[in-house]
Amino acid sequence: MENCKVIAITNQKGGVGKTTTTVNLGVGLASSGKRVLLVDADPQGSLTVSLGVKNPDELDVSLSSLMQSVIDDEPLAEGAIIRHQEGVDLLPSNIELSGMETGLFNVMSREYVLKNAIDGMRKSYDYILIDCMPSLGMMTVNALVAADSVIIPSQPNFLSTKGLNLLLRS
């Protein structure tokens, strides 16, 4: 599927609906016949837990594992993608992603690690949706580099729009 669209869902403010938007948009696209991969790029793993993974910290393979494979220039770890009953695939996250984000500061071309990890998956999907953490850290920068477009959920209040303005200026 060479026309795969990668979309990052981000806002520097927490609690504005990034994960909810990711899940609902993904399931909606899947119900209309699209092949969808949801990527949890937040070490809190809210997207992963939302899709029924009870203990994400016990997963053998996660987004962090795939990114480490890219950094080590090794084949991508297999078994990371979880098929969900709602018709979407999930690339889960767990607390290991916090260590990955910190470690990225010592990696050459660090902002391209996520892009390199998911580029090979584009042929299998119509859409790849990346649920970002509520900060403009290195993982969010990676998601923005990997993305073709961005959705910035916002609520009509001061702090939410402040997060939107900070992101747009970054």
Write out the residue ranges for each language-model feature.
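P-loop NTP-binding core
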Residues: M1-S170
